[in-house]
């Protein structure tokens, strides 16, 4: 959620073209990297990741998980969250939006696109692993309470 808050500030700064701490009389003209649309995606995406983590944490309590299974769910979710943050931030600077390692219909490939794509791919795999562990887990006898 802290990443979402920081991205929200970057969104505001990119929209007004300056760093401002209103109501303080501080207004520093600055060219903020990225675009308002990109910072909006980082802001909302990071917030959704935080909500996903909370939801998975709540749902995991409904199942009997071994230490190893709990670790897969926990680390799979953590890796996915930070991988998504990389995707949102670096995808903003990639002409292909970080959706592939090569050029695509959206634009050409660059380093930012690769830095966006690779962690996101790994995060998708770890999140699938976490969700599969939860789907295969036995319900807890205290799940209803």
Residues covered by each model-derived region:
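Membrane-water interface of alpha-helical transmembrane segments
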Residues: 33-36, 40, 67-74, 110-120
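Short, membrane-exposed interhelical loops at transmembrane-helix boundaries
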Residues: 99-115
